[in-house]
């Protein structure tokens, strides 16, 4: 279900929200739920970092292959020049 995150505001349906841990902050709700929320958040952050790393790796690979292609052309041209002479 949809969770609304209010920062400086609380109402009964929101379980006194303060901080960024969702509605599990006040410790009367359930300590396990609080820990679970924190764990899930950490997991999501980790997954996101992995995704970002993968993205940059892809970019790097693309650049590398482009460079290799360019080098290939360069070497062929050099070989042709040597053949000319």
UniProtKB/Swiss-Prot annotation:
The keyword Lipid metabolism does not apply. GO terms for cellular component: extracellular region. GO terms for molecular function: toxin activity. It is found in: Secreted. Expressed by the venom duct. The keyword Transport does not apply. Keywords: Secreted, Toxin. Belongs to the turripeptide family. Turritoxin PaIAb was only sequenced until Met-61. Is lethal to drosophila larvae. This is Turripeptide PaIAa. It comes from Polystira albida (White giant-turris). The lineage of its organism: Eukaryota, Metazoa, Spiralia, Lophotrochozoa, Mollusca.
């Amino acid at each position: 279900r949809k969770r609304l995150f209010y920062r400086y505001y609380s109402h009964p349906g929101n379980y006194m929200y303060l901080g960024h841990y969702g509605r599990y902050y006040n410790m009367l709700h359930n300590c396990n739920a609080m820990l679970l929320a924190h764990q899930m958040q950490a997991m999501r952050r980790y997954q996101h970092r992995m995704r970002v790393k993968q993205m940059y790796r892809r970019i790097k690979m693309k650049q590398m292959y482009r460079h290799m292609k360019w080098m290939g052309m360069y070497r062929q041209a050099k070989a042709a020049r040597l053949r000319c002479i």
